[in-house]
Amino acid sequence: MTLTQEFDTIAAISTPLGEGAIAIVRLSGTDALKIAQSVYKGKNLAQVASHTINYGHIFEEERLVDEVMVSVMRAPKTFTREDIVEINTHGGIAVTQEILQLLLRNGARLAEPGEFTKRAFLNGRIDLAQAESVMDLIRAKTDKAANIAVKQLDGSLSKMINNIRQEILESLAQVEVNIDYPEYDDVETMTSQMLLEKTAHFEQLLENLLSTAKRGKILREGLKTAIIGRPNVGKSSLLNQLLREEKAIVTDIAGTTRDVITEFANIGGVPLELVDTAGIRETDDLVEAIGIERSKKALAEADLVLLVLDASLELTDKDLELLELSKNANRIVLLNKTDLPEKLDINQISGDFIRISALKNENLSAVEEKINQIFFAGEIEAKDATVLSNARHISLVEEALKALKEANNGLALGLPVDLIQVDVTRCWQLLGEITGEAAPDELITQLFSQFCLGK
């Protein structure tokens, strides 16, 4: 059982700054109740039951600051495993800042970014992977990304990593006993063949986990998607339909989009970072020319390319150039303006295409299905599956897998078991960095500094 560490009492505004119905000022620490009581008039907070909400007022000496509801949660059954007080105020900037300053003047310290979650980690309530999933849940752009984050917050990834580490540790312990106590008969001798079988098993477990990384990373970070095409083929209309709001100017004047517009859209649970590029054409307009160069750069960096062609016109040389330019990309060719008579010769297009009308919002569901087919083999999210999505976790699993492969290569070359133990131990340590069991203090500090204030 992890013992709660002794810390000072911290305070921060936990809701976004700005105007709203309510805001929350949070306290955590040994003196949380005492400091809150020093500015609160209502029930005696030291005597109220845990996990209750209490009506009262905040005063600065005799001056009324706000009418509030105060939540009291006593250690250890709290997020930080410390006493927590949350003051629910009216959601104005001035009043929340004033209440925070009152708490700071009465003994609290302003929390650092992510310090509440850091205390939850240091006090043993969550591990490092779960702590990171808190931020992933906050930043999730779709329901499926949120589902992955909440499963990791619930400990699914941590449980899998801990189970693998435990198996590795048992093998390492057996090697150690064989080395240190060769005369001990009650422990089976770990031969090179036995260790090879075990490391091959661990390798398979990590490869299975790593196979989920592509799907997880896409759902967490999104697909960088470039919408390309000649001017006035309907790129901005498509962007507006995918976003379900007007973000781009739509006219029949070529060159209206003179730069790169970037927005996020939720397409069937997949976050698309949509880049509406300036129409690629020859132009003497300097500003538009710069936009076109950026469009070409966006095309080169894109995970997915949506090439829009005007089906109501014959293909131009520029259309054919774009078809050639994007042929090696993950590309979906969209024949737009199907609400008009079709003049485009489909025999000039190699590969699949989808007919749509961005203006009429027709057949865009087929685009969603095609994206799922390209990136997820038709299945976006396997139910109850543990998915790797965090870039740090993916990198550590890759390094751990590399260490196992080096161990296997050494065993194949006939190296002694005690030398192979070094690589297997490194694998075990790398996996421990995911959960925080073996993470250096500098890494922990750096990770929590990326959190928002009040979390």
UniProtKB/Swiss-Prot annotation:
Provide the cofactor note recorded for this chain's UniProt entry: Binds 1 potassium ion per subunit.
Q: Where in the cell is it found?
A: Cytoplasm
Q: Known EC number(s)?
A: 3.6.-.-
According to the UniProt record, one GO cellular component term is: cytosol
What's the domain of life for this entry? Answer: Bacteria
Which one GO biological process term can you cite for this protein? Answer: tRNA wobble uridine modification
User: What residues bind K(+), as annotated?
Assistant: N232, T251, I253, T256
Q: Where does Mg(2+) bind?
A: S236, T257
Per UniProt, residues of the TrmE-type G domain are 222-376
Q: Which cofactors is this protein said to need?
A: K(+)
Q: Which CDD domains match?
A: trmE, TrmE_N
| Primary site of residence | cytoplasm
Gene3D superfamilies attached to this UniProt entry: P-loop containing nucleotide triphosphate hydrolases, Probable tRNA modification gtpase trme, domain 1, tRNA modification GTPase MnmE domain 2
Q: Which UniProt keywords apply?
A: Cytoplasm, GTP-binding, Hydrolase, Magnesium, Metal-binding, Nucleotide-binding, Potassium, tRNA processing
Q: Which GO terms describe its molecular function?
A: GTP binding; GTPase activity; metal ion binding
Which family, according to the similarity comment? Belongs to the TRAFAC class TrmE-Era-EngA-EngB-Septin-like GTPase superfamily. TrmE GTPase family.
Instruction: Please describe what this protein does.
Output: Exhibits a very high intrinsic GTPase hydrolysis rate. Involved in the addition of a carboxymethylaminomethyl (cmnm) group at the wobble position (U34) of certain tRNAs, forming tRNA-cmnm(5)s(2)U34.
Q: How does it assemble?
A: Homodimer. Heterotetramer of two MnmE and two MnmG subunits.
Q: What is this protein called?
A: tRNA modification GTPase MnmE
By which gene is this protein encoded? Answer: mnmE
